[in-house]
Amino acid sequence: MDITIHNPLIRRPLFSWLAPSRIFDQIFGEHLQESELLPASPSLSPFLMRSPIFRMPSWLETGLSEMRLEKDKFSVNLDVKHFSPEELKVKVLGDMVEIHGKHEERQDEHGFIAREFNRKYRIPADVDPLTITSSLSLDGVLTVSAPRKQSDVPERSIPITREEKPAIAGAQRK
């Protein structure tokens, strides 16, 4: 059974994409778009112009995290394209893998920026923490992965027996 855990934003209703509902939903660290600096067009509401749905292409390509639990492998993919390998640390703390990235203030095309993040992921019980590896792709995606231990217990059917007494005291059989 493969399990993919995506960014929680994807599971939000469509209407909630139209405007940030909380301060944490706002897009910090992103530059303003030209449309946000100009007066609103009468045909388009300023509410819609500032909505994340109009910013989706640039927004969805930065900072995404995906955890996958496949039949034979556990993996985490994290967009860290704004960090060099020297600015990243991956470590195991008990049953968690922690990824930390930090770079000091530096100038970019929009001014000065400093970034820092810290992510923790629970290591599945069937993964040996000593087998965890990490790699950074050319396009800035950090992959942390490990093989899953294969179960030695073979699959078997378990028969169902019928009891003559109710599971809940006082319940009557209908």
From Swiss-Prot:
May contribute to the transparency and refractive index of the lens. PROSITE patterns: SHSP (PS01031). Residues 148-174 are annotated as: Disordered. Pfam families: Crystallin, HSP20. Residues 149-166 have a biased composition (Basic and acidic residues). This is Alpha-crystallin B chain. Lens as well as other tissues. It comes from the Eukaryota. Residues 55-163 form the sHSP domain. Heteromer composed of three CRYAA and one CRYAB subunits. Aggregates with homologous proteins, including the small heat shock protein HSPB1, to form large heteromeric complexes. Inter-subunit bridging via zinc ions enhances stability, which is crucial as there is no protein turn over in the lens. Belongs to the small heat shock protein (HSP20) family. Zn(2+) 2 binds at residues 103, 105. One of its GO terms (cellular component) is nucleus. Gene3D superfamilies: 2.60.40.790. The keyword Acetylation applies. GO terms for molecular function: metal ion binding; protein homodimerization activity; structural constituent of eye lens; unfolded protein binding. Zn(2+) 1 binds at residues 82, 110. The modification N-acetylmethionine is found at residue 1. It comes from Anas platyrhynchos. Keywords: Acetylation, Eye lens protein, Metal-binding, Zinc. GO terms for biological process: negative regulation of apoptotic process; protein refolding; response to heat.
